[in-house]
């Protein structure tokens, strides 16, 4: 037996910068993970005390080596240099990640000691405290700094590089997307899925009827044309109006569920909208560790991505058991910040797959919840036992021994008599030498006591019944100390409840004040941060009272509930379901704009002495009124101009009907002295900031503008109203479109400001009003109003109105520019697409070429490929054979394979009887396959190192999935077999997805590869026998060597046949094998296998056991050199073993029959074998009949060709005779002409009268 040898790694972090320190390990102690920094000095003292109590035989401290690096923290014994490293003896003391070190302490009394607290078990909340001593106390800060820096780097790496397990261990299922449903609540009855499916079918049938109806007839009122959802491509929406009543729905029967859902469906314009049947609705439903993905194999993109926290409900159909759906939260459109609940409905191939999906979802939710709970940081509440110990350690920190002892005695009185007696007895047993040692012992026993209590403690607010039961069981027989302790706890609870009550009262007062301030006045110059902080407190108090946390248990019928249990998610969900008015009232102090759907503006609140209103003074603002105009504003009788309360809708400003009330005049009077009007419109904070920046940024603003009269900041009429205040009173309520243009005067101060501060802009430039867009859609200011000037400066030039011709030219120019931009964008998209295609092709063909193709050979291939109508032209096969032997250019290989397939079809015009149905590729992709699990598993195994297929569910894997899925649907007998993914992958690397599918059909049906993938695998057994016979005939010594060690071809050659060498050999070699398969057929695989084994025969014969021989053939033999590969390819071109393969196949069947006849069997066994033989013979007869039919068809076609050739030959002979007669007649005429030319005296004969003699 050979000895087991291994090499131990001395340095644990060789690839990173690691630091090691020589230290003395004083000891360790398990403590609770809630141990705080004030407790740690007492823990260190306990560890040192326990270390001092060790026996004399054992050393008090242990020499260790501490290795620190960002990837780990490792402590191992420090051996002497003479002692050898033995991994069986010298195991590490502890090893952990540096981010698990959550506390470090340096002892100030003894600087050579330090301790670290390491999280060991997050589930049981256990930590370990290790205490070290350094020989040089000056190095302790360096050690602590190194550990902290390593933890910091490790945490940054975790954030930078997220976990890769989500995609690796994700479960994938193929589903058919049925439709999308908008529901009113995050819960739904189990019958929701069935009702949605029925509605989908009903609407689809109605739409189909509408499409089939003639266009001339008026269409009946029915569902509107289907529209896509804005959130996801190809997803449709259905709305539910009312909320589902969870309690009643769960207690009712299924029939009541049906009626309830029927009542919740919206009629009218919002109708059921299922998906488009013409689109490819198949999706890959991927369940990760914390998310659910919906990937479209057609578009190669993620169609939907939802976190587990967003999914609130999962359910399977009751009547439609092959359907399921889940409800999730989605953001509402329009940027309003709200959300709604959407149910997605899917279909699977069968019920078993739906059950598996539901079980996987439930397990994923459970695991994610456990992980989230484990990751949640442990916190102390006011009632925690360790919190009392923490406060005690804080109080005694820095005290001398005597004062510490007094504090400890006071604290011990709060314990029960039994606990006090136990601690006193334990301390007296150990006989402390001094007060300090006695204090350490008391703290140690208190820590143990409180840690035991902490295990049974439930934090404040957690629904745990143990504390309630314990509180109820407290009797009157408790000692006085315990009663005092109980009294203190009750007082603490009373304080907390009183504080919470006061805070809730104050929050309600803040809400009322916020509503009153909204309707009366808003302090726009107050601090935004203070407002936000106050409002956040108000929301945190008010919302928690208003919305109780709903239960989060799993539902019946395999349904799963919401994973997130935090109150914030429920608060956000419930607040979104409120009316806009309620939401608006709650956030009146913080929102910088009104909600979009506010039904009515809030009425102005009456001024009360209890509510103080701040003054709003803008001393740096510019007044747009003269003193005379301000006096006019305050005339009695309701003539004063005021700005209305602005609702969310944008009507033009109008006078408030209550403007004539006495209170309204009071507000106007206050407004003249700087206070806001009761109807003032609160403006956006961003608008005010922008306006202040605009004014403050101008360095030329004169100082005297500070002393101008303050202007109401809420008066939007000053900004966008085109008329003066005293002039707008008469026509403000009328139609402003028909009024003539009024003049508006600027004061001479305003003219100075407009000319000095912004001289480059006209006074009525639209840019002055860009920052007012958040006020609402008020009537725009007209650029045609002339401005009269009453100051010392001249009139300001107004912009002239453009003529219709100029406007037409501007429109024409804008349209032409837009057309040009669109064309340029299209060209850019085309260029980007072509660039992506080139990059994709380069990525696919990223392999080393075996036989470099010369330029002359490439020219020959390009000439043949560019021949017009090449699919109908037969090329010389000797020329094609020679070209393939000389090499195939890599960038033309896919096109050459299609060319060879076309030549095969021309050579064999009558295909075999087993041709598949001609179903379009796109139609196959729209169906679900039952082979999805096997295909999805093999996707990650197919060329895992190639960049095109390496990405999990990337473009390469999705295209490969589409091809394999389509073939499994096309060929139901074969379906999917392991090995097909490599064949399809090789094809996909050299051509497009649909072309690769066509070539896969050609290889399977025309080239005969389909037989070896049948479920019975009989053809594969025959192929193994044929390979053994070839070895026996061509390489007898190698065959004997393999038989001697009982190595059959199935141990090493099965993947060669099933994957066509693609799973083990380099891609360049496999591509050359495919070149020859397209040219010669499936017998090329035998030739390549025989050539490989024969060329490596000397090396195989050197190995003398089964393991080494098989390992050499599987691992060493595929790593061929370029020379050996070229030699193998050239040998394959010279081989011809077709007759041998046919003879070996017949031999296999004969031997099989002989073995069946010779073996003594019972009657039943003989009957079964005869039946199997009969069925196999029938199959062979059918195959022979097919071959006979093909041969007869070929014979008939050849006979017809011969007949055609004979008839054409007779016609050609007759034509030849006719031409011969005509030729002889012409020759006679030429002779006659020569004779006549020899006799010049005689008259020339008339050539027109000459006729050919004879026939």
Curated annotation (Swiss-Prot):
The modification Phosphothreonine is found at residues 499, 590, 1218. SMART domains: PTB, TBC. The keyword Nucleus applies. The modification Phosphotyrosine is found at residue 1039. Residues 519-539 have a biased composition (Low complexity). Expressed in highest levels in hematopoietic cells, testis and kidney. InterPro entries: DUF3350, PH-like_dom_sf, PTB/PI_dom, Rab-GAP-TBC_dom, Rab-GAP_TBC_sf, Rab_GAP_TBC_domain. Residues 238-398 form the PID domain. Residues 887-1081 form the Rab-GAP TBC domain. Keywords: GTPase activation, Nucleus, Phosphoprotein. Residues 208-228, 509-544, 559-581, 595-614, 621-681, 764-786, 1233-1255 are annotated as: Disordered. It is found in: Nucleus. SUPFAM superfamilies: PH domain-like, Ypt/Rab-GAP domain of gyp1p. Disulfide bonds: none annotated. GO terms for biological process: negative regulation of insulin secretion involved in cellular response to glucose stimulus. GO terms for molecular function: GTPase activator activity. Residues 670-679 have a biased composition (Polar residues). Interacts with APPL2 (via BAR domain); interaction is dependent of TBC1D1 phosphorylation at Ser-229; interaction diminishes the phosphorylation of TBC1D1 at Thr-590, resulting in inhibition of SLC2A4/GLUT4 translocation and glucose uptake. May act as a GTPase-activating protein for Rab family protein(s). May play a role in the cell cycle and differentiation of various tissues. Involved in the trafficking and translocation of GLUT4-containing vesicles and insulin-stimulated glucose uptake into cells. This is TBC1 domain family member 1. It comes from Mus musculus.
